[in-house]
Every structure is written in structure tokens, then in C-alpha cells.
């Protein structure tokens, strides 16, 4: 038994040759099996030759930070709100605020913080191609903003009075500023400041003011805009009758300016305060208004006289769709320096007269109504006429000549003074008056002579 064990040990100690290996290995004979074992050869099996070169295994370290879910924490410059937003859904909800509270919803990303939050805004005085005078916009924006602010120990005038010459674009400039600020004003006109019923205009002002206050209470900016206040509440010489409604309109505006947050309607008296509503009024001559209304504590006054740059800017907006060069616009403005801004709008409209005249001659005067109102094809369309500098200057001179005719003739004074057209019948009137006076004098003399004869007869 001992021999068999040693034999097995010898068999197990047989050296292995990897380089010179053969298909099979011989098994030594042992006493345990009784006879020597046959050599077994594996057919069709060959071991690949292994190179004598030394094998070197290289392990490359993987940089896991490139795939890190929190990589934005070290390569992005942002605030805590951005970092918390990245961790939404990755952190236990126990340590997060409820959804929708704003903590995990970023308002801006890092680029927007740099490009928008640090942006300085300038007063852009253009709106849809129309020009807004910087001084005009500054006055309105500051006045409206002041009335919505709470300034310490400062009484802000509630009313802003914009006044100036006729046709200078006061109302249109106000509308542009309102659109620029996103304000939808409550508008009134001078025709609403008079009524057949005493007290109606004053009540209407209070109603409109409270409507604007309700809009402000709902979170939208609003103001009360009154056009041509002096035409409805002012006194234009001795020919204007001063009525009770004029007095009540002035008194109502004064009361609202003194108590802007306590405006009551007739029959409705409560202590609930309303929102403060800035009031913008326009006019041509505020000296015709009641003096206590326009004092500094109640009304801030702004005289609007457009400069040459303002007139050029507004005219560029008027001719913006007509392909008129800027040099031509400047030439037109300088050619009519004493005209109002409205003059240039009328000048542009006058250019279309030729197109309308051509359409009328081609249609016929008898068919104008049918073509304009009852045509299946709709109203006629016109091609935009070509506006040249020469044509605009020609029509401008025609408008100036018409203005001069009105100033020169002054038929109204002639009508009131002579009841005749000009001096055509002046001689006839004077002759008629002298004849009538002579006849009246002779008639009086005859009556006196008759009375004298009658007295003498009685005596």
C-alpha cells in the first residue's frame, strides 16, 4: 500500500513543459492497476503556442467626475436656486419644500441672470415707428409713477395739465405714452362736461374716476384722461356763458385733487378708501380755467412746445410708410417753421386728392354712392402715390395760402359789423341810413308843427 502511494506521488511530480508539450502524456505503470496503462493521444486537439514575451496588464483609471450628476455645482456660476433645482427628485422629499412653492423652480438660468437681471434699461422713445418726444414722455412717466408711489412727507399733485398751441400733438403723444406703459386710460372729452341736467357732468367725473380706481385695485395701471378741459370748463371771453355745471366740474376736480382716495358718489357714503388715480388733462389755454384749480398743489402744469428735433422726429413717423428720405423730411419741416405738427398730417392727406380725383372721373359722379356703399367688390383700393419733395412743397404752399385767406378776409367780423359781404354794400348802407334819418327828422318836424297849430286854435 505504501508503494502505491509513493508511485502516485511520483506521478504527480511529473514536470509540465508548456513550450514543448505534445498531444498526450504517458502515464507510468503502477502496482495499483496491475499492469502498465496505455498511452492516450488526443486526436485533433492542439494547444496554441504561447509567446516567450512577458505579458503586461495596464489598468486605466476612469474619471467618474465627467459623468457626475452634480457636475453643475463646480463648473457653473449660479445661485442657490439653480443648484436646488438640479437636485429636484434626487433628494429625499422629506428635506424639500412642497412642489410649486418656488424653491425648486428656477426663475432664470445663469445666462439670463447675467443678460437680464443686470441689464440697465433706457427710455426708448419709439413705439411702432412713431416718435415720442423725450421731454413729453419723461413728464408723463414721472407724474404717473409718482402717483402710484408712497413718498414720505411729500404731497404729489394728482392732476397733470398738458397745454400748448393747437395741433401740436398733445393728445396723440399722451396716447403713445399710455400704450408704451401698458395703460388703458378712462377717457373723457370736453363735450361731456356740460349737460341739460345740473350736476350730471360732476357725477360723471366721479363715476369715471371710481371705474379707474377699480381697475387699479385689480392690479392693472389706469388713469383718467380728459381732453380739452379748457373748452368745456373754461371761459372764452364774454361770449361764453358760465353755467352751474362749469362751477361743479371745477369744484369736483378740486375736491378729488384734495382727497384722491375718498371719492364718493351721490347717495353712496362709506369710509372704504379707493385707489389713487392720476388725472391727465389737455388744453390750449389754462388761463381760462378757475384759478384755484390750477394752483401748484393740485395741478402740475406742463407747457408743450415741440423743438425742431421733436418736429422732425414726429414727421418721420408721419411719412414712415411713404418712402420719403430723411433729408426730404428735414427740408419740409424747415420750409414751414411756423406750422403745427398737424399741418404735416394734412399735407400728407392732400397728396391723395389726385388719386381720389382720378377715381371719381373714372366712375362718374352719379355712381359714387353705389360704388362706395353697395358694391359687391367692396370699397375701392388705391395704390400708394409717390411722394416727392417737390409735390409735398407744392401742396404745403397751397395749405399756407388757404390759411392766409382765412386770416386776411375775416368775414365773421364783417358779418357782425355791417351785416354784408365785405365792403360791397357799404355805400348803399350809408346812403340808406342817411335817407332814413332825413325822413325821420322831417316827420318829427311836421308833427311838432301840427301840435303848435292845434294849440293856437284852442287859444
Swiss-Prot record:
The keyword Nucleotide-binding is annotated on this UniProt entry: yes
ATP-binding in keyword set: yes
InterPro entries assigned: ATPase_AAA_core, P-loop_NTPase, RCA-like, RuBisCO_activase_AAA_helical
Record-linked Gene3D superfamilies: 1.10.8.1070, P-loop containing nucleotide triphosphate hydrolases (3.40.50.300)
Any one cellular-component term (Gene Ontology): thylakoid
SUPFAM superfamilies assigned: P-loop containing nucleoside triphosphate hydrolases
One GO MF term: ATP binding
Keywords: ATP-binding, Chloroplast, Nucleotide-binding, Plastid, Transit peptide
Location in or out of the cell: Plastid, Chloroplast stroma
Chain sites annotated for binding ATP: 164-171
Pfam families with a match to the protein in the record: AAA, RuBisCO_activase_AAA_helical
Function summary: Activation of RuBisCO (ribulose-1,5-bisphosphate carboxylase/oxygenase; EC 4.1.1.39) involves the ATP-dependent carboxylation of the epsilon-amino group of lysine leading to a carbamate structure.
Family statement: Belongs to the RuBisCO activase family.
Name of the protein described by the UniProt record: Ribulose bisphosphate carboxylase/oxygenase activase, chloroplastic
Amino acid at each position: 500500500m505504501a508503494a502505491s502511494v509513493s508511485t502516485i506521488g511520483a506521478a504527480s511530480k511529473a514536470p509540465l513543459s508548456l513550450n514543448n508539450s505534445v498531444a498526450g502524456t504517458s502515464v507510468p505503470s503502477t502496482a495499483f492497476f496491475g499492469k502498465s496503462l496505455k498511452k492516450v493521444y488526443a486526436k485533433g486537439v492542439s494547444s496554441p503556442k504561447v509567446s516567450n514575451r512577458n505579458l503586461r496588464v495596464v489598468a486605466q483609471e476612469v474619471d467618474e467626475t465627467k459623468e457626475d450628476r452634480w457636475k453643475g455645482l463646480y463648473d457653473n456660476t449660479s445661485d442657490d436656486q439653480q443648484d436646488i433645482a438640479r437636485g429636484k427628485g434626487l433628494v429625499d422629499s422629506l428635506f424639500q419644500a412642497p412642489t410649486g412653492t418656488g424653491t425648486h423652480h428656477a426663475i432664470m438660468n445663469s445666462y439670463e441672470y447675467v443678460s437680464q437681471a443686470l441689464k440697465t434699461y433706457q427710455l426708448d422713445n419709439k413705439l411702432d415707428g412713431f416718435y415720442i418726444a423725450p421731454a413729453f414722455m419723461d413728464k408723463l412717466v414721472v407724474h404717473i409713477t409718482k402717483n402710484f408711489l408712497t413718498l414720505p412727507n411729500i404731497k404729489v399733485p394728482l392732476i397733470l395739465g398738458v397745454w400748448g398751441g393747437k395741433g401740436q400733438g398733445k393728445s396723440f403723444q399722451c396716447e403713445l405714452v399710455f400704450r408704451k406703459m401698458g395703460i388703458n386710460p378712462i377717457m373723457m372729452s370736453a363735450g361731456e362736461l356740460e349737460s341739460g341736467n345740473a350736476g350730471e357732468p360732476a357725477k360723471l367725473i366721479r363715476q369715471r374716476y371710481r371705474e379707474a380706481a377699480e381697475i387699479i385695485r385689480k392690479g392693472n395701471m389706469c388713469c383718467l384722461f380728459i381732453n380739452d378741459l379748457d373748452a368745456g370748463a373754461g371761459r372764452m371771453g364774454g361770449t361764453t356763458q358760465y353755467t352751474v355745471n362749469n362751477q361743479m366740474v371745477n369744484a369736483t376736480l378740486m375736491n378729488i385733487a384734495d382727497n384722491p382716495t375718498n371719492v364718493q358718489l351721490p347717495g353712496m357714503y362709506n369710509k372704504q378708501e379707493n385707489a389713487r388715480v392720476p388725472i391727465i388733462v389737455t388744453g390750449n389755454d389754462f388761463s381760462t380755467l378757475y384759478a384755484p384749480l390750477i394752483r401748484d398743489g393740485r395741478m402740475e402744469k406742463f407747457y408743450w412746445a415741440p423743438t425742431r428735433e421733436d418736429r422732425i422726429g414726429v414727421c418721420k413717423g408721419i411719412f414712415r410708410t411713404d418712402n420719403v428720405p430723411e433729408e426730404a423730411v428735414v427740408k419740409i419741416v424747415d420750409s414751414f417753421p411756423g406750422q403745427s405738427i398737424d399741418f404735416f398730417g394734412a399735407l400728407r392727406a392732400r397728396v391723395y386728392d389726385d388719386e381720389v380725383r382720378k377715381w371719381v372721373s373714372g366712375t362718374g359722379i352719379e355712381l359714387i354712392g353705389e360704388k362706395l356703399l353697395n358694391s359687391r367688390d367692396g370699397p375701392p383700393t388705391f395704390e400708394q402715390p409717390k411722394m416727392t419733395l417737390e409735390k409735398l412743397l407744392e401742396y404745403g404752399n397751397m395749405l399756407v395760402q388757404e390759411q392766409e385767406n382765412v386770416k386776411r378776409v375775416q368775414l365773421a367780423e364783417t358779418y357782425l359789423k355791417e351785416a354784408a359781404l365785405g365792403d360791397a354794400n357799404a355805400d348803399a348802407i350809408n346812403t340808406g341810413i342817411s335817407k332814413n334819418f332825413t325822413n325821420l327828422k322831417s316827420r318829427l318836424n311836421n308833427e311838432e308843427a301840427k301840435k303848435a297849430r292845434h294849440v293856437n286854435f284852442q287859444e
